[in-house]
Amino acid sequence: MKRMLINATQQEELRVALVDGQRLYDLDIEHSGSEQKKSNIYKGKITRIEPSLEAAFVDYGEEKNGFLPLKEISKNYFPENHIETLGFNIKNVLQEGQEVIVQISKEERGTKGAALTTFISLAGSYLVLMPNSPKSGGISRRIEGNDRIALKELLTLLELPEEMSLIIRTAGAGKSIESLRWDLSLRLQHWKTIQIIAKSRTAPFLIHQESNIIVRAFRDYLRQDIGEILIDNPKILDLARKHITFLGRPDFVNKIKLYSGEVPLFSYFQIETQINSAFQRKVRLPSGGSIMVDSTEALTAIDINSSRSTSGTDIASTAFNTNLEAVDEISRQLRLRDLGGLIVIDFIDMSAISHQRAIENRLREIARDDRARIQIGQISRFGLLEMSRQRLSSSLGESSHHICPRCTGTGTIRDNESLSLSILRLIEEEALKENTYEVRAIVPVEIACYLLNEKRDAVHAIEKRQAGGKTIIVPSKKMKTPHYSVSRIRKSESKNYTRYGLSNIRQSKITSFLKKNLLKKKQKEILDVANFNFYDNCYNKIQEAQENILKKNNYNNILLKVLSNNRNFIFKMITWFKNSFFIKNMLITSDIFKKNTLKNTNNIFFKKKYSSLNKKNNNQKKRVILSKLFEANIENIPLKNKKLDTSSANYLYDNIERKKNITKKNDLIQKNIHENSYLKHVLMNRYNVINIINNNYIFYKIFNRTKIFKNQNTNNSFLKFSSVTSPIFIFSSVFSLELALGKVWIKYPIAILDETKKQKKLNRKQILHISSISETNTIVNKNNYSGIKKIKHETYSFKKYVKNNIQNQEVTQSQLIKRTKKRNVFILDKKNFLYKRTCNRKNKIHQSSAPITKISKQSDLNKKEKEFHYNLSMMKSSLRGKNSAGVHSATNFSNSPVSKLK
């Protein structure tokens, strides 16, 4: 009994086999990555017309353009006034850029593109519709006798549109007129759908794709003699039943069964060995003979050998029986391998003409069962028979094999001795050329051993003939015969010597060792901030962790370490480039630092006064406290000293303190601000980024914005003032990596400061002509009573708000501020910026009679005086006041009362 076996256990490969008992007679294999393209319908565009070939090249959406000959162009594309009797040039039929509907008639092979046709054919279960071929109708040649006569009568009853034709397939034999009409209606509807899709889009694109292997198997292979269809996959079983019903073959639904045996389906029917024979060059015959199958670009050659065959009584009978046995196996191998094109068979010599005719008749008889069209010739006087077979799809070898990289498809390679002598002659030829400095030959190890041992004298003679030239032979383990490389180096070219494989290995090991050591040096131990738990005792724990960090590391290396914590490569690159830009624009060279910065001093960023004193709260003593627990022990930070753009607002850095000033001199840790409250509002703020610095300190990266400052320009000069006290605002501000990202959102706390009556009285006695800056960005002169009254009113309102809101009395958080990248920076010392009365007289001693705007002498900057401790970046106001002698305009300073802190 004949069966159809479908193996679908492996999703990468689907196999369909037709067996007669346990003999395999047809096979179809489809791989997941190489679906069949034949019979696919595309809308293509003419890219080039070649009159010499009478053909056109069509772009249909694949890598290689398709080949469309003139004979495969339908008359629908011909001009209306053409005459059939006259010859037509393809240039008069098609034009470049014209869109056509084409179907693939032959698959791509090697470097050749697919063969195309405009004569579309739509295959169904019982018939094939050809919508633009009016003269191609007929009945399958396999249908004979009464069935053929009956089908001719049924063809006249089918209603077919004009300029269309159809072919009744072998499966249509014995079918009723209703079945044929149903199949025809499906094909007509399919053609209408193709035309609608083709008009909807421009070329190139795929219109219709040929069905998968299961649908093709049911459509092409199902015949009445198939008694059973076995499938070893339940999912494919359900799919097969749906397809077979849709194809109009309900008589086969009950024949579909699920195979659930423990032994694989193909192994159970013992056909795996027969399938493997389709991949081999040599196929054994039952009598002991063999056939050899060799495929080339031009044709497929099949040779028959008797070998140890003893099937006959004499030589003639043995040759005849072996050839007769080979004919059956050849026809089977042609179907299994799906070989197409020209095929030449070399039979064993037979002197009897009757034997030759018997072989030809047997081959024609077997070919009738083949789906492909086959044309068979006669055995020539040389014992060769020529035949051609229709190429239905890519052969099994083309879809499953690849060219051998060593022999490049020839099947043989040159022996070592012959190859060595050929390389030696090539070296000698290259050495004889003029201006040759060196000839290098990279060869396999076997060839190198032969040349350096057996042909040592010949190589030495070539070097002598070079007159100072060199001949270098390098063995390569990676290279196998017959591959080699011979190159010629001229005297003017670079002379980088080719090294042996061992040297390359050593060099790679050395470089990898050095890279590891460099990485170890660069990637020092970094404190993981994510593992910290900030609670009441967090400050002590942070101090303990700081002791394990290496000290005095460069700021650039610190940034690299922070970046190395992030595993995202893209984030690293973006942050690195932006941070480099930040350092380049913010940190200046040591030369500029020496000119404009006092030695042995630490600088902080200064912000001007926000509120004035209130008479009602004279006895209260509150100070602004933000960064009371952390300090930055940075000395001589170089910052770029240039005129900064302050068109929008002044953004200041401040509160970088020494630890000694925090713990000893400055009374920053007050009863008003508790440590837990500070940690809650600052440390646990998710907008603040904590960075652990190896210089034994920790600081926050925050930027503050003030709306109090009036738009001003800075000058490239610094002045020295004595140490005096004054009520000021200290905002938490530290460098941030997030500055490199362009924008930062920050929260920062503030508190209020009031001084005593005694301090107010001392402030009123100050001689310096100074003025105050209000919240509305206006400068208020001390004689402007209305302005001072307005400031006091605003201050009183603010004090009243804080007093009513007890929770906000200690710490008041400002709103979130969006921080852009370009900002203004000023540097000042972070000590109490206040004036003493005694310092005013000393300042007058150092003042000249003529006003100056810049200190030009470096010696003045290097003077050491006990009373001078600060660097001040002066800000020039748009309102011009009377300049004091020896300094900038004093209108840039606060007019608020100043006094000494107790």
From Swiss-Prot:
Cofactor(s) listed in the protein's UniProt record: Zn(2+); Mg(2+)
UniProt: Mg(2+) binding residues: 303, 346
Location(s), subcellular: Cytoplasm; Cell inner membrane
Predominant cellular place of this UniProt entry's protein: cytoplasm
Binding site for Zn(2+): 404, 407
Any one GO biological process: rRNA processing
Pfam families: RNase_E_G (PF10150), RNase_E_G_Thio (PF20833), S1 (PF00575)
EC annotation from Swiss-Prot or TrEMBL: 3.1.26.12
Statement: the UniProt record of this protein carries the keyword Chaperone: no
GO molecular function, one term: magnesium ion binding
Keywords for the protein's UniProt record, in alphabetical order: Cell inner membrane, Cell membrane, Cytoplasm, Endonuclease, Hydrolase, Magnesium, Membrane, Metal-binding, Nuclease, RNA-binding, rRNA processing, rRNA-binding, tRNA processing, tRNA-binding, Zinc
Residues covered by region (Required for zinc-mediated homotetramerization and catalytic activity): 404-407
UniProt keyword Phosphoprotein, yes or no: no
Domain of life, source organism: Bacteria
S1 motif domain: residues covered: 39-119
Cofactor note: Binds 2 Zn(2+) ions per homotetramer. Binds 1 Mg(2+) ion per subunit.
Catalysed transformations (reactions): Endonucleolytic cleavage of single-stranded RNA in A- and U-rich regions
GO cellular component: cytoplasm; cytoplasmic side of plasma membrane
Ranges of Polar residues composition bias in the record: 889-902
Membrane topology: Peripheral membrane protein
Family recorded in the similarity comment: Belongs to the RNase E/G family. RNase E subfamily.
HAMAP family: RNase_E
Protein purpose: Endoribonuclease that plays a central role in RNA processing and decay. Required for the maturation of 5S and 16S rRNAs and the majority of tRNAs. Also involved in the degradation of most mRNAs.
Quaternary structure note: Component of the RNA degradosome, which is a multiprotein complex involved in RNA processing and mRNA degradation. Within the RNA degradosome, RNase E assembles into a homotetramer formed by a dimer of dimers.
Name the record gives this protein: Ribonuclease E
Source organism per UniProt: Buchnera aphidicola subsp. Acyrthosiphon pisum (strain APS)
